[in-house]
Design a protein with these regions (language model features):
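Short aromatic-enriched loop/helix-cap "lid" or pocket-rim segments at secondary-structure transitions
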Residues: 28, 108, 134-135
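Canonical Radical SAM [4Fe-4S] cluster-binding loop centered on the CxxxCxxC motif
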Residues: 4-46
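Core AdoMet radical
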Residues: 33-48, 54-74, 85-103, 117-146
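Generic hydrophobic, helix-prone segments enriched in Leu/Val/Ile
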Residues: 16-17, 23, 52, 85, ...
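Alpha-helical scaffolding segments of alpha/beta enzyme cores, especially the outer helices
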Residues: 50, 76-83, 107-111, 144-151
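A structural motif corresponding to the C-terminal end of an alpha-helix
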Residues: 87-88, 148-157
Length: 157
């Protein structure tokens, strides 16, 4: 599985697919994302360190995706992301976050801000048709409105 790439066209950035402890929601009907996980933090860190070693900083932006939300990555990996950003002059990092973790976003942004790194949070809303999103896709946002979602998410997909 390829875990590093460079996106050159729309919103140029480097992107890494890291491995974490797995999505805690695991109910989205269309998703097999949660299958790429490992409960061994040291194994995850070793794999993630190999992937992050490929980052060059070419666009000063890094997108970090994983088998869940940013909070499913171990602390050593999170520290290595910060170190990589500092060493490669990356000023903006994009992370994914499921709605169930939205209260953890401010602490993440503050931690990275201490290192002069801007954090952008992306969440997979998929649709604002609440009935379809919750009863068919099983996304777990409840009746959250776009206004509520934008209080923690900078980007939606």
């Amino acid at each position: 599985m390829e875990r590093y790439s460079v996106l050159k066209d729309k919103n140029p950035r480097e992107i890494v697919l890291l491995r974490g402890s797995g999505c805690k929601w695991k109910r989205c009907t269309f998703c097999d994302y949660h299958l790429d996980y490992c409960l061994d933090e040291e194994d995850n860190y070793n794999l993630n360190a190999q992937v992050l070693s490929k980052v060059t900083g070419i666009y000063n932006k890094l997108e970090v995706i994983n088998s869940g939300s940013f909070c499913d990555l171990d602390n050593k990996t999170m520290d290595l992301i910060i170190k990589t950003c500092e060493e490669k002059n990356i000023s903006t990092v994009h992370f994914e976050c499921h709605y169930i973790h939205h209260k953890e976003v401010p602490a993440l942004k503050e931690k990275f801000k201490e290192h002069n790194i801007n954090v952008r949070i992306k969440t997979g809303v998929e649709t604002f048709d609440v009935d379809y999103r919750e009863n068919v896709m099983k996304k777990g946002f409840g009746k959250s409105t776009p206004e509520k979602i934008r209080t923690y998410a900078d980007e939606v997909c």
